[in-house]
Design a protein with these regions (language model features):
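Amphipathic alpha-helical polymerization modules
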Residues: 1-223
């Protein structure tokens, strides 16, 4: 493959990856706690782009539901799936059959040191993540920040794997609310139009290159 064709192929591959992130963002615009994905340059031989999460807070939607918790400020809830620690941003929690606090996907929320139970009238979650049933302490939600959002890897069910450096959490928990996805619909539409136009221009360049190569080969044949 010639240098010219390699450059064109890389440009088209980059556009395809970018369109994939835009599609994923648009599909999750109504998913609580969803973090927008951005494709950023990756200067390596293995990949042209890598994905990074937009850490901007989404707007807070009041639900008045006791087990809905919104985070404000950078950071994640720590949950557990089959013994593996994972991170989630969505606080749409529920109580399972054992009285444990779990995500909508069934992952155990780390922090509570006693069953939450089904009587939620007296359940209180403080801004620092402390859990209370009336005056009885139920523990402290495990909350962390990540040093490198680019190292977060999707684990399914709105969760992420992370093996990088962690930091203390200093944000705020809001009970009875959910964080909306931090997706700007207008911004995604503009990105879609720009990337689509660029991909179309790359495809035209491929067509021009093919015609030029065919012409050159035919001339060689005539000689």
């Amino acid at each position: 493959m010639t240098d010219t064709l390699q450059a064109i192929a890389r440009a088209l591959s980059t556009d395809v990856q970018t369109l994939g992130t835009i599609s994923h963002n648009v599909a999750n615009m109504n998913t609580p706690g969803y973090r927008g994905v951005r494709a950023v340059p990756e200067f390596s031989q293995q990949a042209l782009l890598r994905t990074s999460l937009d850490q901007t807070d989404g707007s807070v939607m009041q639900t008045a539901r006791k087990l809905d918790l919104a985070l404000q400020g950078p950071g994640f809830f720590v949950v557990e799936r089959e013994g593996e620690p994972l991170l989630v941003r969505s606080g749409a929690f529920r109580v399972d059959a054992q009285g444990q606090l779990v995500t909508a996907n069934g992952d155990l929320v780390r922090g509570p040191n006693a069953p939450i139970g089904t009587d939620l009238d007296a359940l209180r979650v403080d801004a620092d993540g402390a859990l209370w049933n009336g005056t009885q302490s139920l523990g402290q939600l495990e909350l962390i920040t990540v040093a490198d959002a680019g190292a977060l890897r999707p684990a399914g069910g709105g969760a992420y794997r992370y093996e990088g450096e962690q930091g203390p959490w200093s944000g705020q928990v809001i009970q009875g609310a959910l964080e909306a996805a931090n997706i700007d619909a207008a911004g995604e539409t503009i990105r879609l139009m720009e990337t689509t136009r660029h991909a179309e221009s790359v495809q035209r360049a491929i067509s021009i290159y093919d015609k030029a190569m065919d012409t050159g080969i035919n001339r060689l044949g005539d000689n």
